[in-house]
Swiss-Prot record:
Iron as UniProt keyword: no
Membrane topology, record value: Multi-pass membrane protein
Gene Ontology, cellular component aspect: plasma membrane
Name of encoding gene: nuoH
Source species: Wolinella succinogenes (strain ATCC 29543 / DSM 1740 / CCUG 13145 / JCM 31913 / LMG 7466 / NCTC 11488 / FDC 602W) (Vibrio succinogenes)
PANTHER family per record: NADH DEHYDROGENASE SUBUNIT 1, NADH-UBIQUINONE OXIDOREDUCTASE CHAIN 1
InterPro entries: NADH_UbQ_OxRdtase_su1/FPO, NADH_UbQ_OxRdtase_su1_CS
Compartments, as annotated in UniProt: Cell inner membrane
Enzyme class per UniProt: translocase
A GO MF term: oxidoreductase activity, acting on NAD(P)H, quinone or similar compound as acceptor
Any single GO BP term: aerobic respiration
Protein name in the entry: NADH-quinone oxidoreductase subunit H
NCBIfam families: PRK06076.1-2
Length: 329
């Protein structure tokens, strides 16, 4: 094998290992943050401050019985969780996580595939991930699962359009679909960040991201009070876990995308090196995702569609038109 292939394989293994662990650890962080905001303690008994709770949860998931309902389409039922988890990690392959660095005299580029349509690839693979909940709900032979699948299709397709339209305006300014080029466009300092020239695009992209991740207040796919666990109702054990590993991995990817698109990416921030700066910015957005879950109420499906098609979509189109006019002038 050529050195390039070996390096790519090593990068894939490192990304999958690190972000699988981070996705699991994020569940612990979420429980502690929610507990703090609700005046509770959260996990406390497994390890110091409950930090080993993720190991206990992992053992529980691996040892639980894997049940396939009698009325389910077994092949599709088993494939659906794999689609959700796989697309989450495939999307990461075009995301530049850090600036280049030297390791044992070799220059390492912390991106698996530096393609010139990086943002398009990430959004496209993320859209394919919709088939996970859709196939899971359709194949389960359960009415609650089917309702969850229907909600997943409507919600994710609708907000995928908003997500794509929202980033058109900043892409028009940059003139490239490459995430590295978008990062380099903001290399002049904090005042070159695209969030200052495209605040509406940032808000639209962030809201659409919440909806595509199935995060509060847009958690309609598996809302317990209405449709039990939605598309995941009939799942147990590690198959159930794969859905939520995919969800938290997508959350990390979205945080990186927001930072790369609007907040200077991995460019140095004053005296802070670029690698540390991007981690701090990503951590802020991950905390924001958890904070919103604790603070915001659940909304109805009709309200969600109204917001998408009658508020967010026109605003995204208006932003594109205004940006085009400004660029022409």
């Amino acid at each position: 094998m050529t050195p390039y292939i070996i390096e790519t394989i090593l990068k894939v293994l490192v990304v999958v290992a690190i972000f699988s662990a981070l996705a699991g650890f994020l569940t612990y962080v979420e429980r502690k943050v929610l507990a703090f905001m609700q005046r509770r303690l959260g996990p406390m008994h497994v390890g110091p401050y409950g930090v080993l709770q993720i190991l206990a949860d992992g053992i529980k998931l691996f040892t639980k019985e894997d049940i396939v309902p009698v009325g389910a389409n077994q092949t599709i039922f088993k494939i659906a969780p794999v689609i959700s988890a796989a697309t989450a990690f495939i999307a990461m392959s075009a995301v530049p996580f850090f600036p280049e660095f030297e390791l044992f005299g070799h220059t390492v580029r912390p991106i698996i595939a530096d393609i010139n349509v990086g943002i398009l690839f990430v959004l496209g693979v993320g859209a394919v991930g919709m088939y996970g909940p859709l196939l899971a709900g359709m194949s389960s032979g359960n009415k609650w699962s089917l309702l969850g699948a229907a909600r997943a299709t409507v919600q994710l397709l609708s907000f995928e359009v908003v997500s794509g339209l929202s980033i058109l305006a900043p892409l028009m300014m940059v003139g490239s679909l490459s995430l590295i080029e978008i990062n380099n466009y903001q290399s002049g300092g904090i005042f070159d960040w695209l969030v200052w020239s495209q605040p509406l695009a940032f808000l639209l992209f962030l809201i659409a991201g919440y909806a595509e991740l199935n995060r509060t207040p847009f958690d309609l796919l598996e809302h317990e009070a209405e449709i039990v666990a939605g598309f995941a109702t009939e799942y147990s054990g590690m198959r159930w876990g794969m859905f939520f590993i995919g969800e938290y991995a997508n959350m990390i990817t979205l945080a990186f995308l927001v930072v790369l698109l609007f907040f200077g990416g991995f460019n140095p921030l004053w005296f802070i090196p670029g690698g540390i700066a991007i981690l701090l910015k990503v951590a802020v957005f991950l905390f924001l995702f958890l904070w919103v879950r604790a603070a915001w109420p659940h909304i109805r499906p009709d309200q969600l569609m109204w917001v998408c098609w009658k508020v967010l979509m026109p605003l995204a189109l208006l932003n594109i038109v205004l940006t085009g006019i400004v660029l022409i002038l």
